[in-house]
Amino acid sequence: MRIASSSGILMDANGKANGSAPSALVAYFLGMGFSREMVFRAIKEIGDTDSEQILELLLTYQAIGSDPSVGNSSHSACDPQILEEEDEEEDVNWDEDDTVDNFDRATYSDGSGDEDFLQEMSEKDEKIKSLVSMGFPEDEDTEFSSFGGRKKTKLIDGSKKKRERYRSRPQWNQVPFDGSHEEPMPLPNSMVGFSLPNDGLRSVHRNLPDQALGPPFFYYENVALAPKGVWTTISRFLYDIYPEFVYSKYFCAAARKRGYIHNLPIKNRNYTRGVSRTARYRALGNSFQVDTVAYHLSVLRDIFPNGMNVLSLFSGIGGAEVALHRLGICMKTVVLVEISEVNMTLLRSWWDQTQTGTLIEIADVQNLTAERIELFIRRFGGFDLVIGGSPCNNLAGSNRYHRDGLEGKHSALFYHYYRILDSVKTIMASIFGAKGKLFRHVRKALLLKQSSSLTLKTEQDPSNNSDKDSMDK
């Protein structure tokens, strides 16, 4: 016998929804805004005994847009459930690693797969219009297109699986998507970076070249699973620093594979993960993976006890700024470069509610010229941190033909990051002269020091008050 609860959930005699999960547990997650199908799917995979793990899985579903209710109500050629049933025999020889690798590449692609889907649907609409103009009824056209699309998608999906299996092998002889012949940068099997919270620092020898040392510190982020040669090129432009590849699942509910190039110290990092469910849920919405970035930036807390001047490029909705705020690092001045007015509005609202420093907004990174950079440096006494991650639209996504590497329209903006960083370093070295050299020597000592934390201090020039705050570290 089934009884309808007050929340509209059918219960059996044992008080379980649909005979598989306690109705109270289902109602709890439905009240949080998750769809019924998503909740049942998560409980089916995890069981009904650990609500914490169920929530983690639901957050992951929501972050990657994997809502089973979408697939069940559509006959689209993109329906993964139909394809998985049809390809069951073909997948007999798959192992779990292949599945996980393909799942990561296909779904954790930072939203660029949405653009592929929209373009595919637009092309499908054009095909239907063409068939209607030839005299076919629209219903028949749709059925024909859906059937043909499903068959074609099955073939493409099968080809993609074979390609992914091949891609999991050494890639030294593959032709890069962007036409370059850069040697690939192999990704580590376990993306744990230089260290993990509550885990001792492994033996990492990181000798940064002199030109990579500050001022300022810099921090660059992008997707780890980029086309062949991309990270080699990025590393070459950023002073041949080897990236720190990190899988964010070690830090928060979202699962993202990222690469970071920076000249920060790697000793004495502190973990700052929000332990509450609400904190982890909010972290999913930030442009950077806040927990991961905060862990890396935590070394700056003792170096800049009086606050920082930050140049934030491609800021999104402020993941970097949120990370610094959570670390308790005062942001005296932030020059923000973000082209999206929606993102800018969200970040400005957050800033007004939480910060007391100065926020300067620039819409387009191309408008940040060397002349404007020099004006800012003279006005605020220099930048302590240049941080950002250029768009990954041409580096990730399910449609490999859109992956143009660093030659793509959006990903090519990386070169503006390098241009601006190089201008900041050159101008600051020219303005501050010997003081900049002193900073560089102390920075090098900090990076080489193997003992306890070192608080960085530099001498002050009483005759020059314009750069007093930013150089008093």
UniProtKB/Swiss-Prot annotation:
**GO annotations of cellular component type:** nucleus
**Predominant subcellular localization, coarse grouping:** nucleus
The question of whether Electron transport is a record keyword is answered with no
All copies of the SAM-dependent MTase DRM-type domain together span: 204-431
Q: Where in the cell is it found?
A: Nucleus
Instruction: Name the family the entry cites.
Output: Belongs to the class I-like SAM-binding methyltransferase superfamily. DRM-methyltransferase family.
Q: What is this protein called?
A: DNA (cytosine-5)-methyltransferase DRM1A
Q: Which organism is it from?
A: Oryza sativa subsp. japonica
